Design a protein with these regions (language model features):
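Conserved beta-strand-loop-alpha-helix junction that forms the acyl-donor binding cleft
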Residues: 34-36
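Acidic, Ala/Val/Gly-enriched low-complexity intrinsically disordered segments
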Residues: 5, 9-10, 14-17
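Conserved active-site tyrosine of GNAT-family acetyltransferases
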Residues: 40-45, 107, 138
Length: 148
């Protein structure tokens, strides 16, 4: 199958201009959808320490240097994906700065059920150890630790 290569190798870019890579192109934000702003604001603050910010009449969660733009009841985004995101249909992974056992304890102390893991998974920095859980709308969330 064509996609088996993605499991074993990095596919080089066909673009010979590598300035973008040297400049450190990074993901700026992603969009999630929620069904209840209050409930989701509380969840992302408690679990991730998110700062809830208003941007042009919309809500975003800032988690470290990452930003989640939030679509929800009453919002009318100017730009939408061809198939807009809906509550519960996203899958996001955040890097945990310590041992994965600390992440599990962090979640359990906040009454959040770990759905799967710890298990070895591949992430942006290579192999790591992950746990999976869900936000109140069912969005799949993953914490990955690269700590040895």
């Amino acid at each position: 199958m064509w996609h088996s290569a993605f499991r074993t190798a990095v596919i080089p870019s066909v673009d010979s201009d590598t300035r973008l890579y040297r400049a450190g192109v990074r993901l700026d934000h992603v969009v999630i959808a929620v069904s209840d702003f209050e409930r989701s604001n509380a969840f992302y603050r408690v679990v991730f320490g998110a700062e809830v910010v208003a941007i042009d009449g919309r809500v975003a969660y800032r988690v470290g240097e990452q930003q989640l733009n939030v679509h929800g009841p009453g919002t009318r985004p100017a730009m939408l994906a061809r198939i807009p995101v809906a509550p519960g249909n996203s899958d996001l992974c955040f890097e945990w700065p310590g041992a994965i056992e600390e992440a599990v304890e962090h979640l359990r102390a906040r009454g959040i059920r770990v759905e799967a893991g710890p298990m070895t998974r591949g992430g942006a920095k290579g192999p790591g150890t992950s746990v999976y859980f869900r936000d109140p709308d069912g969005t799949l969330l993953e914490l990955i630790s690269y700590a040895s």
